[in-house]
């Protein structure tokens, strides 16, 4: 059932974080979908998608996205940690995740576009996030 799957996912994510917690490392996690589970009303699942209620859209469409930094990583990369903290409330689409990874690793390539890395000071939300034809998700 859904609750057991959520508990198992939490167990796996926690295990991975513990595995890397004593190294100079980061762990990136994101979910494959959002889910409303009694967040502000007696409702569960991804229904009611045609509504314009921002709370409904937030809980059903936003996905968890997390960057965990080990204490060693945080201590040795304070500038990167500040950039991560500044990015917390920025809208982001996971198809730009490779840009974030390039940025975190300091990869210098013509494929790196800093304006597409949510943790970069040059980040610009470029893509329209569409719910349906003619309906944008803000």
Each model region followed by its residue ranges:
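Catalytic domains that recognize anionic headgroups
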Residues: 1-138
């Amino acid at each position: 059932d859904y609750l057991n799957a959520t508990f198992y996912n939490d167990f796996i994510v926690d295990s991975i974080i513990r595995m890397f917690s004593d190294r100079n490392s980061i762990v990136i996690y994101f979910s494959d979908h959002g889910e409303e589970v009694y967040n502000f009303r007696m409702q569960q699942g991804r229904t009611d998608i045609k509504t314009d209620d921002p709370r409904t859209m937030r809980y059903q469409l936003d996905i968890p996205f997390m960057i965990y930094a080990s204490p060693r990583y945080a201590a040795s990369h304070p500038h990167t940690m500040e950039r991560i903290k500044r990015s917390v409330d920025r809208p982001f689409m996971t198809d730009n995740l490779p840009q974030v990874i390039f940025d975190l690793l300091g990869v210098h390539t013509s494929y790196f576009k800093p304006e597409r890395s949510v943790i970069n000071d040059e980040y610009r939300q470029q893509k329209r996030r569409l719910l349906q034809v003619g309906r944008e998700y803000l």
